Regions:
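Positively charged, small/polar-rich N-terminal and surface patches that mediate targeting and assembly
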Residues: 1-99
């Protein structure tokens, strides 16, 4: 099994739609076994700090999208996932043992 992890920001958009929603829709359409979107508390990277505080409200938090499925399935989807994420985030892969 393979795990693809995508790190983006909550406010990232593509064609006027939130990127994390586009990614989840894409994964459902391609019948991926499972995916979870995690909200981060704080973070930073090449696009600077991920979290912004406005009058006590946290916005634009980092998001982590974990995707798990068979290696052959996810490897075939990687080019499309990279194209969707583009320069908005980071895509990593690693093998996992599901117990």
């Amino acid at each position: 099994m393979l795990c693809v992890t995508i790190r983006i920001k909550r406010n990232d958009e593509l064609n006027g739609k939130r990127l994390h929603k586009l990614l989840i829709d894409f994964l459902i359409q391609n019948k991926v076994a499972g995916s979870t979107v995690w909200t981060g508390v704080d973070g930073f990277g090449k696009r600077k700090r991920s979290t912004i505080q406005l009058e006590g409200i946290t916005i634009n938090m980092p998001l982590i999208i974990e995707i798990i499925d068979e290696k052959s399935k996810l490897e075939s989807l990687l080019p499309s996932l990279k194209r969707l994420v583009n320069d908005n985030g980071l895509v990593t892969i690693h093998e996992v043992d599901v117990v």
